[in-house]
């Protein structure tokens, strides 16, 4: 097993390599320049390196640009073949009620305190890119084994749903925003179905129901229309004025994983997991998935920033 860490500045991009298959864990940065070079040059170098690997999959821990902007760049380049065998995503797409979580993720990017200089809505940008470059998707949640050697420790879909409902219900109490929240929920459900249709289970359901997934521009046009609704702008202003922190929901869903069998080269990758969730994982809160006594490699949350120690 080899772990390669690409220098993407304030971002994440790791490649876990063995003799059979490689797994790219995140591919993004918030920096416009890295060591004096435009980030597109760094992305091109990474893409060139990845092109030498025949069998590779990609795991996106969550939907922040410092973890996925490189993938979006890669998918937009028409002279590059996106040849991942599979893309792993956190499971916020397998059930209809998860559309509520997607609403919060969409809103999180549009708030003034989102911390995204580009103001790009990362969840929508990812769905848009996947519509143009359809991939095989597998959704990960606590307990799921993937690649025949890794074990998912987070997200826990039941806990995420509970935390989602608490915030969503609070936002829905204001009658001024009931209509626009319903519009957002309907749009989020469409996005959920797009990703779900790329999974093995979802493909079967979509074929049986004979549902049709529209082209990317249709959803882009609809999203622009929603953002132009006066009540939507009023909702964003209200959330900003009341300092409602929705950015955390991008972190709440972050994938955490380790190798499935205890050994000499134990790995623990944590994405940008929240401190309270990392404490739960460390304490083996449900008694099902204990951490190992030692690790050969630990990727700490939030790039090691002190405010996220746990």
Question: Predicted regions: what is each one?
Answer:
Residues 10, 31-33, 63-69, 94-97, ...:
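Active-site environment of divalent metal-dependent phosphoester hydrolases
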Residues 1-53, 249-276:
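Conserved beta-strand hairpin/beta-sheet module of binuclear metal-dependent hydrolase folds
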Residues 77-266:
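Flexible, acidic/histidine-containing loops and adjacent segments that form or flank the divalent-metal
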Residues 26, 70-71, 99-101, 163-164, ...:
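Short, solvent-exposed loop/turn and secondary-structure capping segments
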Residues 266-310:
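Extended hydrophobic/aromatic segments used for targeting, binding, or gating
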Residues 36-89, 287-305:
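Active-site metal-binding motif and surrounding structural segment of the metallo-beta-lactamase
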Residues 36-47, 71-74, 106-130, 279-286:
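Well-ordered, non-membrane alpha-helical segments in soluble/globular domains
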Residues 27-29, 91-92, 155, 271-272, ...:
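Structural motif
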